[in-house]
Structures are given as C-alpha cells and as structure tokens.
C-alpha cells in the first residue's frame, strides 16, 4: 500500500497569465530553459489547481469535517508519533522533489530504473514509460522519510514521470515500488487544457493518482509570498472512497465526518 495519504485543498485562487513557448521556437530554447521553474510561470495554469473556489458546492457537513480533522492524529497515529508528527511545511522530508530534465540536450545525464513490484510490472504502459534508461541528473535524491518519492519531468518530450519508494543501489540503478506518468506536450504546453483534472494516465507516486508535485509550493512562490493554485497536504487517515479529482483512495475511516482523499478545502484568508 502506498502510504502517502493526500488530500487536495484550495486557497483563494486568483488568475495569472503565463508566458508560453511557441511551437516554432528553436529546440535550443528548450535546452537553455530546462531548469526553468515549473511554478513561475505556473505550468498547470488553467487546470483544476487554479479554478475558483467560490462556485464549488459546499458539503452539508463541512463544519463537522473541519471540527473532526484536528482529532484524527490522536485516533490513527502510533503513540510514538503523536507528539511531533503534525501537518506542516516540509522542504526535505515527505514532499515530492521534482527534477526538470531535457532528453534532447546532449549533456543530459541518465539513470537506469527497474521494479519488480506488481503495481508496476502488471501495467504494460508503466513498464514502457517508467522502467529503463530515464533522464535524471546525477545529484538526484528522493525525499527524506518513508515514501522516498520524486518526480522527473522532461521538457523536451513532455513526459512527466513520478516514482514512489525509489532506492539507488551501489551501481547507480534505481529500484522503485510504484510509479505513474502523464504524457504532455513538449515544454508542458497547454497542460492545464489537456489535463484539466491533473490526473496521471496510469499509476501514482501518491495515493490519489494525480500530478501532486504541482500542488506543492515552488521556491519562486515562497520568495514572492504568493501562491495562486491549490495545495495538497497529508493527513493521518481519510474516509473510505475518494472524491474527484482523485482517481483512487486508501482511507479506512468509517466516521461520516472523515474527509475523503481528493476533497477540497478552503482556508479562511482572514
């Protein structure tokens, strides 16, 4: 079971215009910008991550859900975790680092990826797109903590790969337990239009089966003090089932006020 239980919640979303690369611009332009931020401009502009929250339907038990959530850690966390494991901002542990690569760049480094997990090997397209020789910088490391996740987004091809519990052996080969992918246009052009729900085609590096890395806070956003898209966060458990735009869930709670994975929340800006 993938351990990372993720919900999506929405902040008050404002519209922002982003500069898009033209199709007729030379490939060298992509080389030069392979490390350009995914968040400035935000590549998921126009997706569900930037929709307005004011017109979303409100759950009839919204207040009860909000009141129940702070009680969930005491119910589900092991005793040794209760005093310190809280919802928080994480920069090195339990997040999903994203490595932006360019497979058309002759200087791009590569690594071998393999898996024996049935969640991968029983899916023909996951074998095709997430196993084998994958562009990845030599300095890449997964997030700290038990999930050991990271994502690899290729600007040249638009291929967006995500990995769960990735461990590198002494020969430099990455062994992973689960993976997911979405094939976007080169340079992620029109991503919000082509994949409004921000869902992976197959698989996942988190339970919900979405492009969760794009619901994190980018460095440029932190510097500006301004976030114009939905964010995701992790909780101790969730209700059984899931809610759009999540593709799946692994919550076990039968409490009617337990939030579902994929459910949206709004933080009062006051």
What are these regions (language model features)?
Residues 3-9:
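Sec-dependent signal peptide recognition
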Residues 15-16:
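C-terminal motif of bacterial Sec signal peptides marking the signal peptidase cleavage site
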Residues 25-270:
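Short, surface-exposed polybasic-aromatic patches that bind anionic ligands, especially phosphate groups
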């Amino acid at each position: 079971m993938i351990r990372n239980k993720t919900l999506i919640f929405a902040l008050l979303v404002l519209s922002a215009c982003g500069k898009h690369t033209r199709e007729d611009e030379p490939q060298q332009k992509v080389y030069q910008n392979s490390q350009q931020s995914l968040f400035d401009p935000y590549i998921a502009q126009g997706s569900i991550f930037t929709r307005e929250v004011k017109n979303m339907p409100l759950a009839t038990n919204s207040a009860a859900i909000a009141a129940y959530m702070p009680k969930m850690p005491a119910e589900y966390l092991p005793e040794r975790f209760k005093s310190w494991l809280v919802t928080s901002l994480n920069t090195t542990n339990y997040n999903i680092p994203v490595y932006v690569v360019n497979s058309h760049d002759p200087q791009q480094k590569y690594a071998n990826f393999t898996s024996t997990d049935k969640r991968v090997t029983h899916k023909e397209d996951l074998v095709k797109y997430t196993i084998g020789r994958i562009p990845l910088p030599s300095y890449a490391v997964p997030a700290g903590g038990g999930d050991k996740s990271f994502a690899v987004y290729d600007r040249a091809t638009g291929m967006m790969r995500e990995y769960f519990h990735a461990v590198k052996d002494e020969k430099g080969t990455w062994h992973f337990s689960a993976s997911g992918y979405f094939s976007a246009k080169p340079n992620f052009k029109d991503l919000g239009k082509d994949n409004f729900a921000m869902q992976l085609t197959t698989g996942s590096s988190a339970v919900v089966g979405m492009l969760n890395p794009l619901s994190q806070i980018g460095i440029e956003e932190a510097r500006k003090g301004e976030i114009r898209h939905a964010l995701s966060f992790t909780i101790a458990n969730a209700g059984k089932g899931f809610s759009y735009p999540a593709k799946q869930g692994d919550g076990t709670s039968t409490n009617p006020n337990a939030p579902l994975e994929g459910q949206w929340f709004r933080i009062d800006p006051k």
